[in-house]
């Protein structure tokens, strides 16, 4: 599968609502990621007036979802410029165009700096702190699992980060297995087979 096709597939899966990752009372159903991305896209610059519809809790949740995926993507210690650009493109596509590329680039740059300064365990704790509801924790885990499963088999170190995210967010080990099974099933259904 080409890189473009893989990015498109991952973005489609990320945008799909799930039983756990669906915004309550959304009609039509929308994923929590998509809803949080909409608010993040409205985030004002430091000098601007806060716009109507801006939700700082949703912004923090969006950042936590992206950081959870970033922590898994960089778990092996190798996150070169090519991987970073691909990760940024996946996030932009998964947001359905609601967040501009330059905002995602700035966010990923901040995440890289924070990971370098704080280490993975502190960043996992920061993600967990931003998550206040079980369905939000499940969405953080789902998107992180999606990024891990979409590129290849989930490595032991990626699974370890997924488990730490789950436990930090108040979930259990079985939730990691459920998230991985769900994203693999959805990837297979949308593509005909899971990417290898």
Predicted regions, residues:
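Small-residue-enriched hydrophobic alpha-helices in membranes
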Residues: 1-71, 78-196
């Amino acid at each position: 599968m080409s890189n473009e096709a893989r990015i498109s597939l991952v973005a489609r899966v990320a945008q799909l609502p799930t039983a756990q990752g669906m915004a309550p009372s959304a009609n039509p159903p929308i994923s929590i990621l998509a809803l949080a991305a909409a608010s993040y896209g409205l985030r004002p610059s430091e000098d601007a007036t806060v716009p109507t519809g801006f939700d700082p809790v949703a912004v923090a949740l969006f950042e936590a979802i992206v950081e959870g995926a970033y922590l898994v993507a960089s778990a092996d210690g190798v996150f070169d410029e090519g991987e970073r650009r691909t990760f940024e493109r996946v996030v932009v596509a998964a947001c359905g165009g609601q967040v501009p590329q330059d905002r995602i680039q700035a966010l990923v740059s901040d995440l890289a700096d924070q990971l370098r300064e704080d280490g993975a365990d502190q960043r996992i704790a920061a993600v967990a702190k931003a998550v206040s509801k079980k369905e939000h924790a499940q969405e953080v885990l789902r998107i992180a699992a999606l990024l891990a499963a979409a590129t290849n088999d989930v490595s032991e170190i990626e699974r370890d980060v997924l488990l730490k995210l789950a436990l930090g967010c108040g979930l259990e080990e079985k939730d990691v297995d459920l998230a991985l099974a769900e994203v693999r099933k959805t990837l297979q259904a949308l593509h005909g087979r899971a990417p290898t």
